[in-house]
Amino acid sequence: MKEYFKLLGWQSCLLVLIGMLMLRTQIIIPFYQMYFPFTIIPFVDFLAFTFGMVLIMASFNVICSYYDTQMSDIIAKKKPTKAEELEQKNKYRMFWVLAILALAMEGFVAIKDNAWQVLGIGIVFELGAYFYALKYKREYLIGNIVISLLFAIIVFMPMLLEVFAFKNYQSEFPLRIPVVGIQSVMLVFVYFAAFVFLITFIRDLTLDLANLEDNKQKDLITFPVKEGVKATKILLNAVSVLFIALNVWFVYQFYEVIDMVHIVFILVLNIAFPMVYYLVNLNRTKLQMQYVMLYQYLGMVYISLLLTILFAGDIFKINAII
């Protein structure tokens, strides 16, 4: 059972589940309450949609494991045993079962809430995950960018579901949301998507550093293999500084809206400080195991981003009360 949970990537699945629920409860619902006494999408439908995204993430983890094992056997010129072949076949079947279940749930929501675009995005996301594992994961720098984009897209999914449904029901619910209001909530989602993109890129590149020697033996052309450790650290430093700068800008925008010093302090402490700690240790690190520890540490920054959503929701909660 433990092996199956690991194969499904239960940690990333849990992050998707909690993240999407928090984006809805802390940002979307308070935003709607400024203009309507309800939301367009019922909670049960949103829950089905969220579990569909969780299944897509699980299928993504399974297909990545399948192709990693397959590639390792090919490079090592190793003939798999019957037990290993059966395990690989089971992984491939599991991917398609999870993918079909995920798209069935997305299709249910699309039919019930007249938001067919959601099913289209789900199909594109599933195909993106499949081709990432099949091809882009092992390509120079492209793999790091593709995986970061896939994770960033997830951030927009809760809002896109509401937008598509609202557009289709606009004749029943006349549009009363000012353009400024729409821009403000979309700006928050853009910020969080940018945060997720950058932290995923940094984390994936850190993992490439940790697997440097192993990738050399497998003839995989990752960024550290081609450009070296020094160039990789320079790139990581630049992206990390960009991440911190984005956080500072986000906090500044936050302060202008709600003028609460304690929330500003918490936001800086919650995101900028962990990245400064990462930068200090990155430039001191030389051993492979230390890179692995940094990779694991960056997983905690995702949790920091989830906590930040709680404070971002205060923008709309306070405005709703006013």
What positions do the PLM features span?
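Multi-pass alpha-helical membrane architecture of UbiA-family
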Residues: 1-322
